[in-house]
Amino acid sequence: GIGVAQDAVRIEGHAIEVRVNAEDPRADFRPSPGRVTGWGPPEGEGVRVDSAMREGDPIPPFYDSMVAKLIVRGRDRSDAIERSLRAIRDFRIEGVRTTLPLAAFVVGHPDFRDNRVTTRWLEDAGLPRFLKE
């Protein structure tokens, strides 16, 4: 065991993680290799960015396309969603296409806000709606 009784565990807050990939969600998630010509990760309370990427770094076509993980914590789900949307919109990556526009669409969508998404939601409903915008 982990040495902690279940009744001693307290849930505090809510967190959302967004994996930022150098891919084009409008082109069947095709990789977007190139050079990062602008890099400005978001900041703020509850916002963390895990990445080794910097301005001028290359994104080769041969490896995993993930360039960053954005982790946002809020007081509750609603607060985490609002902070996540702000962080996604403030995240500046230039020179390559990324999945950030799709992340903003998903996190801001009423189905996500109301916790009505499933493992099939993006493929069946979310992506078709995103592509129409």
PLM regions: where:
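Catalytic cores of soluble metabolic enzymes centered on carboxylation/carboxyl-transfer
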Residues: 1-133
